[in-house]
Amino acid sequence: MASVLEKTKSKKIVFPTKKELSEAMATYTANLSAKFCKERGYFTVVLSGGDLISWLSELLEPKYQESIEWSKWHIFWVDERVVPLDHEDSNYKLAFDGFLSKVPIPIANIYPIDKDCAALGDAKSAALLYEECLKRLVNRNIIRTYKSSGFPQFDLQLLGMGPDGHMASLFPGHYQIKEKANLVTYITDSPKPPPKRITFTLPVINCASYNLMAVCDEAQADAVAKVFNHNFDLPAAWLTADVEAIWFLDQAAASKIPKGL
């Protein structure tokens, strides 16, 4: 079986420090912002949780604050925990407190999950409503569609991977990784708490123009090595993109990748 990574011209860049990775992520994001704002007047960005938000802090530096057209950004989440939006486990809260509240992106351009579903812990309804939200924005031409498939195509997704090789809330051994019809699905038995989550499906993730997967620390090294050794039991091994899928790794995360890969 040919590697998905080979098919998509996936790249990996290994950075000596997290600081250098963060700086490179900021530059990469800012360059794509300039490209898409000029070409189409919008920049659709998909966030994940975890350490990613702290690495985005480089975009708070004056050179980016002053040059980025923040009013043209539209923010989404590749996955979300179905908890109240002010809960400590909320990816929305993490992103808002650490990044979104510090940049002038219009609040109307930020798309968290439905607050009532979040408060009630209703994962199924939260997934359905988020999918409806995406479809409305496709109809308004804020989100593009991928070629003939009709799936939404985001400009940039900033992703992370767990030590078990999960990305978004697509976990090894769970059926959600095989979902191909829906844009957004849900899980109520996540192996990582909290158990209720919604997540983009794999086709939506892989339709993005640019996917940047940022992974740091030795705890992730085994999973990173398996991904680059084409172990498709790991959801992250299926990552691709329309234009570019790129992995930003620190030295610890990359330490077990077989030579030549």
From Swiss-Prot:
Keywords: Cytoplasm, Hydrolase. Signal peptide: none annotated. One of its GO terms (biological process) is pentose-phosphate shunt. Pfam families: Glucosamine_iso (PF01182). InterPro entries: 6-phosphogluconolactonase_DevB, Glc/Gal-6P_isomerase, NagB/RpiA_transferase-like, PGLS. One of its GO terms (cellular component) is vesicle. Its EC number is 3.1.1.31. One of its GO terms (molecular function) is 6-phosphogluconolactonase activity. Pathway: Carbohydrate degradation; pentose phosphate pathway; D-ribulose 5-phosphate from D-glucose 6-phosphate (oxidative stage): step 2/3. It comes from the Eukaryota. Catalyzes the hydrolysis of 6-phosphogluconolactone to 6-phosphogluconate. This is Probable 6-phosphogluconolactonase 4. The gene is PGL4.
